[in-house]
Swiss-Prot record:
Glycans are attached at residues 265, 276, 444. This is Protocadherin gamma-C4. It comes from Homo sapiens (Human). Residues 1-29 form the signal peptide. The lineage of its organism: Eukaryota, Metazoa, Chordata, Craniata, Vertebrata. The gene is PCDHGC4. SMART domains: CA.
């Protein structure tokens, strides 16, 4: 019954103890689980999932586990229930030694997100060890003269258990001379001493055999015994005496071996051998003390034998005995404590619990990269550890617990600037001098598609000569992307503009992998001069990014078009007859060859040359004007002359064409050139012809007067102006004005605005474009005269005698008048207004695209001249162009192609400045009146 009560009492004590331990952890702010030592595998320690408020369903996914290799050998976590279980039995004595408390810190780590939890497990001691004496037989010698009350220290027993399970008492077998006294040291250990209660009498009893028992406080208690043999010695009545009963010294843990720590002194008043004192360690001094310290037997010097380690043991306490040489020998003992002073001899060590090897560059600031713990076994300030990383890195350290840190991102990451980081973590203690440890964490930055492809230029200009071969490489549009992987793979595509009629894909092809632009067909400058398109570079990221570049392609002109003769024009292989009055002098204008070239620039700059003639000395051809004149006076009996005029451009190689003129005196031209005007009656006589001419002259005067009055009235209604008739037979209203704005157009009237210095500033041809039929050759008879037409439609029955067949004037070549899109920018205008003479020299613009515009304007001017429109009265330097080209464009730098426009039957050319330079008035377009041998019919 008594045993049953005791068992219930023990159970209650254990339950109370476990309850106090469990709740003590919560009071201290830390979860602590008590568990008895030597618990079997699978023993329940605590439910960490419940205590850490974790979802048990996600424990497997988050991989809840115990951190640290040492702790993983003893504990494990059940991922199904979240329970902390014993993995291997724990021996408290092997784990914590003789420490009063055995606390094992545990760290738990979860993933997704990465988190750490801390708890403690207290290993509760179990009374599984019995006290044991160093030896089973203890020998003690006591002089018979020892007085009662003298104490003799005994070797104490050792118990591996701690706390209440350690040694709690000593017992001595019953006897009449000795008693047992137990002293408690500062560390809580008990030291037995033998107390002499009665004087000894060696003669009665020389030795005593006693039993010494050590009992622990476990339940049930365990005990250990040793035999104590006491020998009674002969009288030595003075024992050695120490100066003090206990000594305490301090020494640095870094003290070198061989250092003398203390010298003990003991005196014995006896003489002889009884006064010789010998020092030695007491019998119960542990071996670890004997291995560290050496005690000289005669001098009492305590010498250090090996290195000290404050972190392993911070003090040593043992007994030293002094014995004399008497018989029996007498001895005395003292207590010696050696305290170790901590020295900063241990550098901190860093443990990276968990780290991410790769981090995307889009990670937000505050993302956990690694969990770091630091430890320093030193004490005090030597164990205070601080952690740091380089300042220039976009990372920071956050303190979670004591000596626990989290490495997080502190700013944005850019893989293109830095693709990996070697983060050196430095742990330093606060010792003097401080010690530090380095640990490098390697982190790779994964790419995110945050950079669009970029071209080296925002726009490209490509120049390609016409007549190129299909498939030729035009340009290579390379784009770069600082991203990596698929984010840096670039594909190219052609963007078609919506507002353009010409599709760029019909001219070029784009390689989607390399960005190379190839021509799909041959370019023709006369059809396409420029081509603009956009190319898009797009990466393969998610989402994809892109950029565009504008490409301007300019087609360069090649000399692939031969000059075309506009006037005089004959069918291929035929002659173009030209009439020459008899007995003309030198310098007489026979005709003017007008040619154009569809090319541009120097390729369109034509020159004229007399290639073939029966007598080249009779004729001269102006090199650039194309005027065919007589070089010497022509005799009256000159036979017909066949002149071959070659027209050649300035290209490389130059191209040319030719026109053949048949120049003959007027009597020889009538059989060659048929008269288009049919006569309904035979010629009668000179008197009748004179009558017809007189009637015609009167009619023409009336018509001219009426036209003049009508023109004058219109000019007076529109603005104050003066009427001026030009040599070509065209009248215009001239207005002097200092204002720069032009006059509004009016139908059927040529308006010319003059500046204060008389040059023409504004020309406007109103009304419809009427064709002027070329007049017949100059009449040779005295009663013939030249008829001048008004700008209106030709009158019925009007006599016309063209020098070339009218149907062949343009030979199927129709030149449309220039539209309003042909405008010159300020940078393309050759110069200020001024007159241009009809010399053979001239400067061509250097810019090919300026000359392209000028080429079109020249064609338009030549077309107007060929049609005989009123624009022939243009001002100097304007080449007879209409006002739509602006008064500021005078073509000073272009050869005067007005000289290439020739009006048959007239010596006038398209210039009004020659008269000013020569000091003469321009010649009339109707020439001299001469009689003809033929009748003219209205």
């Amino acid at each position: 019954m008594l045993r049953k009560v005791r068992s219930w009492t023990e159970i209650w004590r254990w339950a109370t103890l476990l309850f106090l331990f469990y709740h003590l952890g919560y009071v201290c702010g830390q979860i602590r689980y008590p568990v008895p030592e030597e618990s079997q595998e699978g023993t329940f320690v605590g439910n960490v999932a419940q205590d850490f408020l974790l979802d048990t369903d996600s424990l497997s996914a988050r991989r809840l586990q115990v951190a640290g290799e040492v702790n993983q050998r003893h504990f494990r976590v059940d991922l199904d229930s979240g329970a902390l279980l014993i993995k291997n039995p724990i021996d408290r004595e092997a784990l914590c030694g003789l420490s009063a408390s055995c606390i094992v810190p545990l760290e738990f780590v979860t993933e997704g997100p990465l988190e750490m939890y801390r708890a403690e497990v207290e290993i509760v001691d179990v009374n599984d060890h019995a006290p044991r004496f160093p030896r089973q037989q203890l020998d003690l010698e006591i002089g018979e003269a020892a007085p009662p009350g003298q104490r003799f220290p005994l070797e104490k027993a050792q118990d591996a258990d701690v706390g209440s399970n350690s040694i709690s008492s000593y017992r001595l077998s019953s006897n009449e001379h000795f008693a047992l006294d137990v002293k408690k040291r500062s560390d809580g250990s008990l030291v037995p001493e033998l107390l002499l209660e009665k004087p000894l009498d060696r003669e009665k009893q020389s030795d005593y055999r006693l039993v010494l028992t050590a009992v622990d406080g476990g339940n049930p208690p365990r005990s250990g015994t040793a035999e104590l043999r006491v020998s009674v010695l002969d009288v030595n009545d003075n024992a050695p005496a120490f100066q003090q009963s206990s000594y305490r010294i301090s020494v640095l843990e870094s003290a070198p071996a061989g250092m003398v720590l203390i010298q003990l002194n003991a005196s014995d008043p006896d003489l002889g051998p009884s006064g010789n004192v010998t020092f030695y360690f007491s019998g119960h001094t542990p071996d670890r003390v004997r291995n560290l310290f050496s005690l000289h037997p005669t001098t009492g010097k305590l010498t250090l034998l090996g290195p000290l380690d404050f972190e392993s043991e911070n003090y040593y306490e043992f007994d030293v005995r002094a014995r004399d040489g008497g018989s029996p020998a007498m001895e005395q003992h003292c207590s010696l404590r050696v305290d170790l002073l901590d020295v900063n001899d241990n550098a901190p060590y860093i443990t990276v619990t968990s780290e991410l090897g790769t981090l995307p560059e889009s990670a937000e600031p505050g993302t956990v990269v690694a969990l770091i713990s630091v430890q320093d076994p030193d004490s005090g300030s030597n164990g205070d550890v601080s952690l740091r990383i380089p300042d220039h890195l976009p990372f920071a350290l956050k303190s979670a617990f004591r000596n626990q840190f989290s490495l997080v991102t502190a700013g944005p990451l850019d893989r293109e600037a830095k693709s990996s980081y070697d983060i050196m973590v430095t742990a330093s203690d606060a010792g003097n001098p401080p010690l530090s440890t380095h640990r490098t964490i390697f982190l790779n930055i994964s790419d995110v598609n945050d950079n669009p492809p970029s071209f080296f230029q925002r726009s490209h200009e490509v120049f390609v000569p016409e007549n190129n071969r299909p498939g030729d490489l035009l340009c290579s549009l390379a784009a770069s992307d600082p991203d990596s992987g698929l984010n840096a793979l670039i594909s190219y595509s052609l963007l078609e503009p919506r507002n353009r009629d010409v599709s760029a894909s019909s001219f070029i092809s784009l390689n989607p992998q390399t960005g190379a632009v190839h021509a799909t067909r041959s370019f023709d400058y006369e059809q396409t001069q420029t081509l603009q398109f956009e190319v898009q570079a797009r990466d393969r990221g998610n989402p994809p990014l892109s950029s565009t570049v504008t490409v301007r392609l300019f087609v360069l002109d090649l000399n692939d078009n031969a000059p075309a003769v506009l006037r005089p024009r004959a069918r291929p292989g035929s002659l173009c007859p030209q009439a020459l009055p008899p007995s003309v002098g030198a310098g007489h204008l026979i005709t003017k060859v007008t040619a154009v070239d569809l090319d541009s620039g120097y390729n369109a700059w034509v020159s004229y040359q007399l290639l073939e003639a029966p007598d080249p000395s009779l004729f001269a051809v102006s090199r650039y004007a194309g005027e065919v004149r007589t070089a010497v006076p022509i005799p009256a009996d000159l036979p017909p002359q066949k002149l071959v005029i070659v027209v050649k451009d300035s290209g490389s190689p130059p191209l040319s064409t030719s026109v053949t003129l048949l120049v003959s005196l007027e009597e020889d031209t009538h059989p060659v050139v048929p008269d288009l005007r049919e006569s309904s009656a035979p010629r009668e006589g000179e008197s009748r012809l004179t009558l017809y001419l007189a009637v015609s002259l009167v009619a023409i005067c009336f018509v001219s007067f009426g036209s003049f009055v009508a023109l004058l009235s219109k000019c007076l209604r529109g603005a104050a102006c003066g009427v001026t008739c030009f040599p070509a037979g065209t009248c215009a209203c001239l207005t002097r004005s200092r204002r720069r704005e032009g006059l509004p157009p009016s139908n059927g009237i040529l308006r010319i605005q003059l500046g204060s210095d008389d040059p023409i500033k504004f020309v406007d041809v109103g009304g419809h474009s009427h064709g002027c039929t070329p007049l017949a050759s100059a009449p040779t008879r005295s009663d013939s005269f030249m008829m001048v037409k008004s700008p209106s439609a030709p009158m019925a029955g009007e006599p016309v005698r063209p020098s070339c067949p009218p149907s062949d004037l343009l030979y199927g070549l129709e030149q449309a008048p220039p539209n309003t899109d042909w405008r010159f920018s300020q940078a393309q205008r050759p110069g200020t207004s001024g007159s241009q003479n009809g010399d053979d020299t001239g400067t061509w613009p250097n810019n090919q695209f300026d000359t392209e515009m000028l080429q079109a304007m020249i064609l338009a001017s030549a077309s107007e001249a060929a049609d005989g429109s009123s624009t022939l009265g243009g001002g100097a330097g304007t080449m007879g162009l209409s006002a739509r080209y602006g008064p500021q464009f005078t073509l000073q730098h272009v050869p005067d192609y007005r000289q290439n426009v020739y009006i048959p039957g007239s010596n006038a050319t398209l210039t009004n400045a020659a008269g000013k330079r020569d000091g003469k008035a321009p010649a009339g377009g109707n020439g001299n009146k001469k009689k003809s041998g033929k009748k003219e019919k209205k």
